[in-house]
Amino acid sequence: MTRQVEQIAITHIARHKGLDPATITPDADLAALGITSLDAIAIAYQIEEDLGIEIPNEEIEGLRTVRDLIDGLHRLTARRE
């Protein structure tokens, strides 16, 4: 599921901001991608729907990079399994 989680995160970021997913790397800074706090909430909601998890607001507030999001999603999906 590791690669799947990464792909879901990148796909939702790209779709939300109208970017090419191929241009988004795990080390990309969310602010540099134009992701605001409201964008992060909207993206998190979409990811929650796809993965069947709940992302706590505290997780969203601490995100700085795409990797931060991916790592948080891995923790949350591991708890579910």
Where would I find each of the regions flagged by the language model?
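Phosphopantetheine carrier-protein modules
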Residues: R15-A32, G52-E59, E81
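Thiotemplate assembly-line natural product biosynthesis machinery
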Residues: M1-A22, T77-E81
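C-terminal structural segments of small proteins and small subunits
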Residues: E54, I60-R80
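Catalytic nucleophile serine of serine hydrolases
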Residues: S37
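Residues within the DNA-recognition helix of helix-turn-helix
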Residues: I43
